[in-house]
């Protein structure tokens, strides 16, 4: 799971830049489309769609590289060969498309969001097999006098051959089924059901509840939850982006941007509101100092100073608003999006440290930025009575001293 998470982190620049190109095709400003048509012609959007398709549109390819590299470092095996065997595996399982004119090729759609789960599973299996073969010593050993740049390719011959053989049999096996390919099997039996569950409000509430409880007990809830859920949420974002690219409407309300830019305003459980409550209302010396320390990091969605400095960890009083805020952000935003107050995210991604309001405008215009402000106010109200309680207790202790 950590390799998958690190693999996604490694391709973040590609995803962010690609989503920004998509943003340029649909900037939410009146008259923008007409202006661009007059400036660049009727097909002006294609100027931005090609970079989008070569980044976000084939994100599975970049994820393969990221995960293979991360696994290679963890297992201490050759990084380059790990990436190579991963691509061998994924290409072996990708069906060849034959056009009416007899042209053959690999459809790019198989490397988009729809191929994400196959890419993740295949990469993990390929590197695992490669590691097993190498660590068992099933390689061709050349004398030490042979230069490493010559010996290395020979050492990889047997592992690479085994990867080819195994995944060729896997390919043949799937072709004998009604699914016809591993791609169709994974998408139908695994990715679609997980996306269907992950895009529902009840499942999201459950995930956020688990995340909150993990944090309360001192575990990094965001890392644990994101390693499982981020591939699902990102694939939903990618499908929204693909729909926009085809001129259709984005349909997945819950996606990566929903979580990152509405639920986590200031960090898990929208703790920017908590930081603001402390700054504006705290009277005790302890919490005044904490407010000054935590506000700037919170503006960039970093809330560890609050979680461990307040602390929220193992704090029964602060655990209550922490859980309530995390879930409330999701419920209220989902309802507002469902009735049309807030637009559905089109899949544009910005760095997770982008401050709220700015991130909202970048991913969806002034309506999203305004909604982020509203959600910060809501979180402020949720945390306010609890901060007043613990601040009063702390102030009494300080006065007794």
Enumerate the predicted regions with their spans.
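Central hydrophobic cores of alpha-helical transmembrane segments
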Residues: 81-90, 226-231, 322-328, 348-349
């Amino acid at each position: 799971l950590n390799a998958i998470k690190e693999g996604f982190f490694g391709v973040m620049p590609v995803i962010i830049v690609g989503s920004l190109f998509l943003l340029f095709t649909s900037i939410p400003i009146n008259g923008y489309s007409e202006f661009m048509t007059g400036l660049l012609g009727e097909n002006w959007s294609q100027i931005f769609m090609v970079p989008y398709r070569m980044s976000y549109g084939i994100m599975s390819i970049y994820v393969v590289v990221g995960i293979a590299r991360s696994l290679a470092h963890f297992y201490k095996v050759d990084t380059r060969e790990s990436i190579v065997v991963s691509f061998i595996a994924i290409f072996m399982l990708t069906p060849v498309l034959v056009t009416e004119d007899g042209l053959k090729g690999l459809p790019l759609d198989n490397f988009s969001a729809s191929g994400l789960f196959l890419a993740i599973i295949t990469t993990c299996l390929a590197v695992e097999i490669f590691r097993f073969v190498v660590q068992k010593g099933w390689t061709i050993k050349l004398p030490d006098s042979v230069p490493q740049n010559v010996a290395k390719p020979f050492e990889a011959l047997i592992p690479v051959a085994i990867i080819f053989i195994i995944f060729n049999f896997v390919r043949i096996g799937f072709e004998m089924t009604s699914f016809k390919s591993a791609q169709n099997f994974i998408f139908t039996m695994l990715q679609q059901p997980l996306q269907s569950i992950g895009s529902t409000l009840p499942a999201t509430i459950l995930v956020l509840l688990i995340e909150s409880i993990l944090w309360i007990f001192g575990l990094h809830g965001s890392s644990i939850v994101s390693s499982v859920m981020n591939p699902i949420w990102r694939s939903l974002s990618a499908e929204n982006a693909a729909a926009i690219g085809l001129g259709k409407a984005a349909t997945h309300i819950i996606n990566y941007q929903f979580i990152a830019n509405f639920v986590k305003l200031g960090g898990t459980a929208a703790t920017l509101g908590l930081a603001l409550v402390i700054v504006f209302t705290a009277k005790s010396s302890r919490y005044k100092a904490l407010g000054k320390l935590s506000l700037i990091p919170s503006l960039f969605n970093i809330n560890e100073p609050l979680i461990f400095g307040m602390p929220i960890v193992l704090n029964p009083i602060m655990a209550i608003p922490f859980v309530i805020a995390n879930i409330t952000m999701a419920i209220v935003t989902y309802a507002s999006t469902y009735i049309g107050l807030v637009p559905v995210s089109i899949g544009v991604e910005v760095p997770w440290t982008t401050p709220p309001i700015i991130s909202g405008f970048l991913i969806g215009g002034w309506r999203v930025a305004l909604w982020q402000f509203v959600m910060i106010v809501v979180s402020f109200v949720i945390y306010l009575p609890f901060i007043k309680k613990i601040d009063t207790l702390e102030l009494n202790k300080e006065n007794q001293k």
